Amino acid sequence: MRYHQDPTTQQPTILLVDDEEFLRRLLARVLGGAGFDVIEAENGAAALRAVAGLDGALRLVVTDIHMPVMNGIEFAREFRPHHPTVPVLFITGRDPGITDDPADFDGHLLRKPFRSETFLAEVGRLLGDGSESLGRDHSVA
């Protein structure tokens, strides 16, 4: 888990959860370049530990679905009751067939591969802050 936060800034904080380190770091760079503070976690269990002390600072979660230890769906089921206003964006390169309940995704599912501009547009849409205009036309996953 890595923290990119600068305690002197008021940038939106995003939790990024993915077991693929290369992709996680690449997406963290994309988000950081767009002005977001990023907290990284390698699986759902690590993500739950990471958010334990954030107290309202977290604005969005981006999580892979298929991960060891605790997958993204299990993480979201544990996370949402404690943070009901924080949206969760699921990303996956495979069939998300882990769940039969479409409510698990809330319509926030982005399939890999995607471009950084598509990713940032979805982040901005979920944050509702106009961030969808950020980003460049680069493939990231």
List PLM regions with ranges.
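Non-catalytic signal-transmission and effector/linker regions of two-component phosphorelay proteins
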Residues: 1-15, 21, 25-28, 52, ...
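Active-site residues of response regulator receiver
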Residues: 64, 92
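A Lys-centered signature of the CheY-like receiver
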Residues: 112
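Acidic catalytic/metal-coordinating carboxylates
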Residues: 42-46, 70-75
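Acidic, metal-coordinating helix/loop segments flanking the phosphotransfer/catalytic sites
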Residues: 40-60
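Conserved phosphoryl-transfer motifs of two-component systems
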Residues: 107-109
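Negatively charged, flexible loop motifs adjacent to catalytic sites
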Residues: 94-98
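Receiver (REC) domain active-site loop signature in two-component systems and cognate sites
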Residues: 67
